[in-house]
Amino acid sequence: MSAANFQPLTPLRFLERSAAVFPDKLAIVCGDRRFTYREFADEATRIARALLASGIEPGDRVAYLCPNLAEMLIAHFAVPLAGGVLVAMNVRLSPAEVGYISRHSGAKLLIVAEELLSSVPDAGSLGDVGEMIVVADSEPEMDARSDGGLRVSSYENLRGRGSLEPLPWAVKDEQATISINYTSGTTGDPKGVLYSHRGAYLNALGEIIHSEHSPSSVYLWTLPMFHCNGWCTTWGVTAIGGTHVCLRAVRPEEIWRLMDAEGVTHLNGAPAVMTAIARAPEAHRFTRKVTVTTAGAAPSPTMIGELEALGARVIHVYGLTEVYGPYSVCEWQPDWHEVDPAERARKLARQGVGMVTAERMRIVDAEMNDVPADGETMGEIVMRGNDVMKGYYRDEDATALAFTGGWFHSGDLGVMHPDGYVELMDRAKDIVISGGENISTVEVEQALVSHPAVVDAAVIGVPDDRLGQMVVLCVVLKEGAEATAGDITGFLKARVSSYKVPKQVLFFADGEIPMTGSDTKVIDRDLLGLVQARLSTTGATP
């Protein structure tokens, strides 16, 4: 193998190519700002040079806490162009969680949007972070200042350290880490998932294929860029030469304004977001082809019907942070046009088959044997291939466990249908997916342990058309103790991120929450029935 027949794969090549092929084409829309592909590449180069001038060395982590701004998109190229590793953090994290990820990742630099400064803990909780860069709408030319021992500078100050001196849009090792994405775990501590340049490159191509992108694509960022690097669409839309339309916050009225003003053709997101869009007062039938790719929870027949009524094509994908976001797609079959809408929606709600760039999924029993493809026998969904993470950062034991038997174990339970399509039946990792966010039930339960009135608690996800799952907290109070639902949620708001606080709090008598014979695990199926019955009587059924 030589340079003549092998070059390491990297998403950096995507921007290099598009800047050469489409130099004057609109690449980014962000508020009043617009960037051509030439300007996109120039800005990535400038920021990469600025990072190098700021002391970033190969392999150093650069953390971002930003909404879907141009700066966040540019980071997906600038950070690896400088040889660094991007750590894009969930903008809804609490200060404690931001501190944990900063310390665990060993980030040297933190770039944060001005409106998220309240989510940043004190300097002593940030570990190796030596400087914080603040992205503000109005960028004053300010000198760097010190805040509790932490150097604080404006984004314009950072830009001023850069230049347009070219850097190679290449890497020596395609297995080098391009980003670390943190995901909730059953212990409540996030795990750092390592993405390689090769995996990101290939998954981005899969996104292009299965979301049906072309150079004419106008992609609206309804999906957070911090979610699996925007399902690798940060790189994919750039690769095909499409236009990125940034969305700072998910508000249906702003989404519809941008849809019409910019001629949006594609958007991704959780069913909760798509339902909000479809039901907005501004909603109207599309006058052009619009492709909606959804994941995070199975789309309900209601949601699919509402989007199709607007003229959208709905594509359902499935994956996890550990597989670069989407790994499978519910590939459309021609005969589905002939079935009634309810049956079509049921078929489309399945998780489907491996993407073109992925290997096939298997459903296995505890001995790693394939279960019958009968649509009834449950087993664990396992995956492998180029679209699987390198491993968990600084956690060899968890990595080894996840890769048992040479396959990545998703922890999700599913069935294999006779047509080879996988259907997810349950989440086996104690994770509730609500509004596209992963919420650790264990974390919420543990946060409540110290409440003086609580003796026991269980968190469960209840199916919900809008959120995918609604988080419900079941509480058992100590004998003689008193507490209201407001007391409980107020207690939790001080300890976990706001999106993890349950939407409903139900009180149960001691012994009423169904447990296994050993009293060590809640029987979720039985508890779900009790919860749904309770919600039904209170009129709070999703």
Residues of each region from the PLM?
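Conserved AMP-binding/adenylate-forming core of the ANL superfamily
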Residues: 3, 7, 12, 16, ...
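Conserved pre-ATP/AMP-binding loop-to-beta segment of ANL
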Residues: 23, 134, 147-153, 160-182, ...
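Structural core segment of the AMP-binding/adenylate-forming
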Residues: 53-54, 81-157, 479-481, 494
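AMP-binding/adenylate-forming catalytic core of the ANL superfamily
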Residues: 93, 110-112, 267, 385, ...
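Conserved AMP-binding/adenylation subdomain of ANL enzymes
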Residues: 201-218, 226-266, 280-281
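Gly/Ser/Thr-rich phosphate-binding loop
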Residues: 239, 261-269, 278-346, 359-360, ...
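Conserved beta-loop-beta connector loops within the AMP-binding
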Residues: 354, 360-382, 418-419, 481-485, ...
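AMP-binding/adenylate-forming catalytic domain of the ANL superfamily
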Residues: 497-521, 538-542
